[in-house]
Each structure stands twice: as C-alpha cells, then as structure tokens.
C-alpha cells in the first residue's frame, strides 16, 4: 500500500539551505494553491536552480532591481516574473537572506483540483500537460505578479504553501543543463527532474534571436 503524501508544511529552514541542496529536494513536494474557487495541488516534478549574483543565468546577476527585489529577501518567499510579454513564472527564494538564490518551478503533476486547472489551461490535450513547463504551471495555478513576495512559509497559511509530500529517492533524480540559458550560465547542470515522469517538460537549448534586417 502506497503511503499518502505528508501534509506537514515545509519550514523556512528547509529553504534557507544552499540552492543546489533545495532544488532537487523540492521534487515530490506538494504545492498548494488556494483560490476563491477552491484549492489546486501540484506535485513538483521539475525545477531549475539559480544561484544569485554569481550565476550568469540568474535575474540577480546584475544586482538588485525593482523587478527582482524579492530574490534578495528572506527564504521561503515567492518570486514571480513576467516574460515574453505574456507569461508568468514562479520561483521560490532560498539560501541565506541577501544571497538572491531561487528555484524555478518548471513542471508538476496536478494531484488535486484538476477540473479547476483545466478551466485555465484550455489548450492542454490531457492532464499531464496542465503544468508541463513553467508558464503552463503558473497559468494552471493562477499565479501572477500579484503573488510576488508571498510568504510560502507563513504560519497562518496563505495563497501558496509547500507541503512535505513524498521526497523522491536520489536514484530517481536526473539533472542536466538549464533550459534556454545561454553563455556561461548554460554550462551548469542545475535543472533537476524526476526520471521518466510524463509531466516533465522537454529540454530546449538556448536559441539566439535573429536580428531584424
């Protein structure tokens, strides 16, 4: 008999560790999104680590700005950014305050509230595609910039909470280069995913944009 996922909330101490420890340890954890229409729960299956100002692939690489300020704050908070003029992506701040490390949630399996998630992801061909990719994940969970700075470790709970879930054994975790990261940041094997999980997004190398002529 398979044991039910642990419903104990993750603590701030969990997120206060180095980003390369936190990222693979988030696999199998459960993200609860509480909305006025009901809860949606997602089992994390794919993540990417970004290690602050020392990481050329990180939003914090060039220092603190109005956009990335949450990254420099306490661990356990949510950093949401808007990209390509249409998509949101969700990250979890980790490491010591001021380090500006974060883990991007790239994909997950909707384990509760799939019917609600489907209303937000009408183009998904099946439930495995509901949160297959960071923008799809944020869309399915109705995560946008209004949730930037949310404390996912708040004792009283809130719109976003992480539960202990069922950690993934190390032999089932794979890692490789981060999707779409160019230059020096592209060499780090800091993308982590659950092996053979159908909700994991396909890897795509960085493709330089063509200049208009």
Swiss-Prot record:
Q: Which InterPro entries match?
A: Formyl_transferase-like_C_sf (IPR011034), MPG (IPR003180), MPG_sf (IPR036995)
Query: Which leading EC class covers this enzyme?
Result: hydrolase
Molecular function (GO) terms for this protein are: alkylbase DNA N-glycosylase activity; DNA binding
Q: Where is this region: Disordered?
A: 165-187
Q: Which UniProt keywords apply?
A: DNA damage, DNA repair, Hydrolase
Signal peptide limits: none
This enzyme's EC code(s): 3.2.2.-
Which Gene Ontology BP annotations are present?
A: base-excision repair
**Database matches in HAMAP family:** 3MGH
Which family, according to the similarity comment?
A: Belongs to the DNA glycosylase MPG family.
Q: What is this protein called?
A: Putative 3-methyladenine DNA glycosylase
Give the species this sequence originates from: Streptomyces avermitilis (strain ATCC 31267 / DSM 46492 / JCM 5070 / NBRC 14893 / NCIMB 12804 / NRRL 8165 / MA-4680)
């Amino acid at each position: 008999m398979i044991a039910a996922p642990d419903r104990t909330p993750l603590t701030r101490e969990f997120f206060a560790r180095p980003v390369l420890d936190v990222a693979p340890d988030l696999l199998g954890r459960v993200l609860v999104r509480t909305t006025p229409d009901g809860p949606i729960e997602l089992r994390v299956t794919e993540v990417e680590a970004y290690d602050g100002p020392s990481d050329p692939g990180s939003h914090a690489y060039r220092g603190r700005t109005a956009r990335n300020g949450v990254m420099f704050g306490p661990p356990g908070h949510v950093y949401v950014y808007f990209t390509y003029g249409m998509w949101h992506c969700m990250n979890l701040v980790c490491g010591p305050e001021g380090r500006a490390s974060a883990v991007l949630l790239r994909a997950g399996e909707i384990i509760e509230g799939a019917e609600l998630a489907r209303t937000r992801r009408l183009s998904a061909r099946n439930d495995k595609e509901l949160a297959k990719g960071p923008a799809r994940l944020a869309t399915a969970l109705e995560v946008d910039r209004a949730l930037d700075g949310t404390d996912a470790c708040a004792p009283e709970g809130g719109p976003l909470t992480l539960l202990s879930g069922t950690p993934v054994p190390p032999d089932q975790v794979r890692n490789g280069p981060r999707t779409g990261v160019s230059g020096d940041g592209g060499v780090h094997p800091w993308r982590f995913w659950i092996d053979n999980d159908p909700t994991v997004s396909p890897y795509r190398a960085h493709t330089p944009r063509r200049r208009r002529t």
